[in-house]
């Protein structure tokens, strides 16, 4: 199956600890955790968002 390697993850704001975004990533090709600058609607500014596992 084509999407068997993809894992659902959440992107959590480093400042307010809210999970603002969800996405998928290929766990075989991207082994390190994602860290992106994204917009946080609670703080109304761009902050660093780090990858967390979703239940």
From Swiss-Prot:
Keywords on record: Ribonucleoprotein, Ribosomal protein
Pfam families, alphabetized: Ribosomal_L33
A Gene Ontology biological process term: translation
Molecular function as annotated in GO: structural constituent of ribosome
Matching InterPro entries: Ribosomal_bL33, Ribosomal_bL33_CS, Ribosomal_bL33_sf, Ribosomal_zn-bd
Family of this protein: Belongs to the bacterial ribosomal protein bL33 family.
Protein name in UniProt: Large ribosomal subunit protein bL33
Organism listed in the record: Campylobacter fetus subsp. fetus (strain 82-40)
